[in-house]
Amino acid sequence: MSFVKKKFHPISRYYNYLFPIAAFLLPLICLPFLSASQKNYSYFIFSIISAVGWFFSIGLREKQLKMAAGQLLQTKIRKIVEKDEGLRKICESVEERQYESQQLRSQNQKLLNQLLHVRSVFMKTKADTQRMEGAIAHLREENQCLQLQLDALSQECREKEEEAQQLNRELADALAYQQVLNEEYQATFTEQHNMLDVRQVYIGKLESKVQDLMCEIRNLLQLESNMVDSFPRQATVNSQEQPKQLLSELKKIAFKVENAEAASSLTASRYIRSESSVHNYSLECRQLFDNLREESLGMLFVYAPQSQRAVFANSLFKTWTGYGVEDFLNAGGDIVISGLPQWETDLRLLDRKERSGKIIIKTKNHGQIPFYYCLTILNKGPLHNHVLGVLYPVRIDAFRG
């Protein structure tokens, strides 16, 4: 019996639903068997609406019954609890525990909501952190690149600074050198200005001296004509004394040259650095050459043994021989046809002693003519270590006609 009750009791609970279900399914079952003219949907629609209303009313009734049963149960429990002190305390404790459980559940829900919020914030923060880490890594790479560029620029800047310092030092040296040059140029300009003043004075003296020399030349020409007439006769009588006389006259001329007023030094560089001297070396040599041109002793010349060339010769070389002094000294046996070895040896004056001798020269216009020569060394003056020499024909009448 209990088994039957246990099995059929749940089924009996839903007996109220049997009629609406049958009312709903019966038209559906009979619908295929009806003809087209007999198909009337009004019954079908009515059955559906009535079934729906029945379901609604049944559900509402069950809900009311459940609420009434619950209230009745609560009332009975409350009465039982009120009668029994132990149960009342248990109920109170249960209610407290339920309240606490409800509070804990609400707190748990709040914490769960907060946890979800924190989790969402954490996930968002984590995403932001990852994004920031990526940005930091990118910035770190850019920083490394910028650091490398900065190191390169710093190295280049140091090199430029060193180069600038080097250029500054070179500029300072150049400015110092330029200052020294300016001072030297200023001193040279002052000295050259003084030299020009001295030259102007000397030119003025030369102009007055030229006028005097013109008069002397006319007198010398007259004396030369007299000497041409008288000297040959004296030469034939005293032919052995003529070289000695030439050497004596040559020594007088050498004495004048050695003791002429010269510069304090024999080089142009020393002359420029001298402050007390105002005479130019070349100007003094020119003055000496002008004085030597006034001498009428014979073919007078000045020879430099080191350079093996003549630095001066008067015009008688061209007049008597027809050759210039360079042609005469360099032609060798073509012009000096006799006494050439002794002449070349004596011309060097290795022992710095006077020399005299005789050579035969082949002139252009007068044939072969013998000449006496005398040589002496200049020991001081602007032309020191130069050879002063003179050549004079044995017979001066060979040039007449």
Swiss-Prot record:
This is UPF0242 protein CCA_01002. It holds the Pfam family UPF0242. InterPro entries: UPF0242_N, UPF0242_PAS. Belongs to the UPF0242 family. It comes from Chlamydia caviae (strain ATCC VR-813 / DSM 19441 / 03DC25 / GPIC) (Chlamydophila caviae).
